[in-house]
Amino acid sequence: MIPTPSLVVDLAAFDHNVDEMARERPGSALRPHVKAFKSTALARRLRDRGGHRSFCCATLREMEGMVDAGLGEDLLLANETLDAERLGRLVRRSPGRVTVAVDSEATLEVAARASASVLVDVDVGMPR
């Protein structure tokens, strides 16, 4: 019996999908979202097999895990954060670029205090 929670992956299917992704969107043209698989081992496989060096994270904790695993070359925080100290520590520890998606003045101020790059999220009337 497999203990739960457990991540079970069909590596042949995973590798096939990575190969397809790499062919369609090589390198940094695709930014896989870490929350989809929550595994630095799979992120490393995406990097090593598919050449993907840019990743999207939902939380600072996911970003910290990626940096700790040596996968912090180009990270995007998709959700806002108000923790400037923690974000600043992450920016200083990361060997590459840390970008924060901002959709409010408060998040923009946090990103600026942390010296993070920003991606401005504009509501064009189709809120998600």
Predicted segments, located by residue:
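Active-site anion-handling motifs in enzyme catalytic cores
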Residues: L11-A13, R25, G65
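Short, well-ordered alpha-helical scaffold segments within catalytic/effector domains
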Residues: L11-V18, T40, L60
